[in-house]
Regions:
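Short, flexible, surface-exposed loop segments at domain boundaries
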Residues: 1-26, 47-109, 119-141
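Homeobox/homeodomain signature
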Residues: 3, 28-30, 42
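Glycine-centered tight beta-turn/hairpin loop motif at sheet-sheet or coil-to-beta transitions
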Residues: 31-35, 103-105
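A cross-kingdom feature marking solvent-exposed beta-strand/loop segments within repeated
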Residues: 34-50, 113-122
Length: 141
């Protein structure tokens, strides 16, 4: 996964409509400042295979290196979509062996109850350091 070119958008699903093919749909996400449309296809990774619905708070990642139409509201191909709980955040980044994100904005503090799994939901029992990780977190002081 070429996460380096992925951009995250967090917001609430305002609308879901039929796409241009039988295997796609258009998801309108309202952020704090604007509406952004995402094309969701069979190639889009939806974490935990959750059925996306209007009103859900989501994080959608799109690849900034792909072409996008110059339209308003903006429209991107969703590469990854995940549902977020209230006050939950998510990041997709490389974490070093000390579990510090590549941009030094996040340090992971794992506990025995920390759930670590692969993209297909299998338990991951190895050290997650030196890996690209999708990390869910809440702010702590």
């Amino acid at each position: 996964m070429a996460y380096e070119t992925y951009q995250k958008v967090i917001g609430s699903i305002q609308n879901i409509s039929r796409g241009t093919s039988c295997c796609s749909f258009l998801m309108a996400v309202q952020t704090e400042t604007e509406t952004i449309n995402f094309v969701v296809t069979g190639e889009t990774l939806v974490i935990d295979n959750i059925r996306l619905r209007r009103g859900m708070r989501v994080a959608a990642f799109y690849d900034t290196s792909l072409p996008a139409p110059a339209i308003y509201p903006p429209q991107y191909q969703a590469e990854l979509v995940t549902v977020l709980r209230q006050n939950q955040n998510v990041t997709l980044d490389y974490f070093d062996r000390n579990l510090v994100s590549e941009d030094n904005s996040l340090k992971l503090n794992l506990s025995p109850t920390t759930r670590i799994s692969t993209l297909n939901g299998q338990r991951f029992s190895c050290n997650p350091g030196d890996e690209e990780l999708l990390v869910y977190y809440t702010n702590t002081t």
